[in-house]
From Swiss-Prot:
Family: Belongs to the PRA-PH family.
Keyword terms: Amino-acid biosynthesis, ATP-binding, Cytoplasm, Histidine biosynthesis, Hydrolase, Nucleotide-binding
Gene Ontology terms, MF aspect: ATP binding; phosphoribosyl-ATP diphosphatase activity
SUPFAM superfamilies membership: all-alpha NTP pyrophosphatases (SSF101386)
Subcellular location: Cytoplasm
One Pfam family of this chain: PRA-PH
Pathway where this protein functions: Amino-acid biosynthesis; L-histidine biosynthesis; L-histidine from 5-phospho-alpha-D-ribose 1-diphosphate: step 2/9
Lineage: Archaea, Thermoproteota, Thermoprotei, Thermoproteales, Thermoproteaceae
GO process annotations (BP): L-histidine biosynthetic process
Entries under InterPro entries matching the protein: HisE (IPR008179), PRib-ATP_PPHydrolase-like (IPR021130)
Gene name of the encoded protein: hisE
Catalytic activity line of the entry: 1-(5-phospho-beta-D-ribosyl)-ATP + H2O = 1-(5-phospho-beta-D-ribosyl)-5'-AMP + diphosphate + H(+)
Cellular component GO terms held in the UniProt record: cytoplasm
EC class of the enzyme, as a word: hydrolase
Protein name according to UniProt: Phosphoribosyl-ATP pyrophosphatase
Amino acid sequence: MSCEILRKLEEVIRRRIEEKNPESYTYRLYSSGIHNVARKVGEEAVEVAVAALAEGKSRIVEEAADLLYHLLVLLNSTGLSLGDVCAELERRMR
């Protein structure tokens, strides 16, 4: 299974940040600063862990999707991309 949806999501995130629409959650999160974005990633990671320990599979999937979204916003906020992470994973597999 390909995860092309992550690349599409990354593009949507980039576009929403560029549009600077104050009604966009993505833009508001991004413009709140790296500390808030990082805090949100931490919160979502904890929610994935809690779901894994005490909730069903569907809840784990939902929380993991939230974590991936917020991680992509974090990467964008630091000038990185999903491609950078994929390159590192490929390097580690050698």
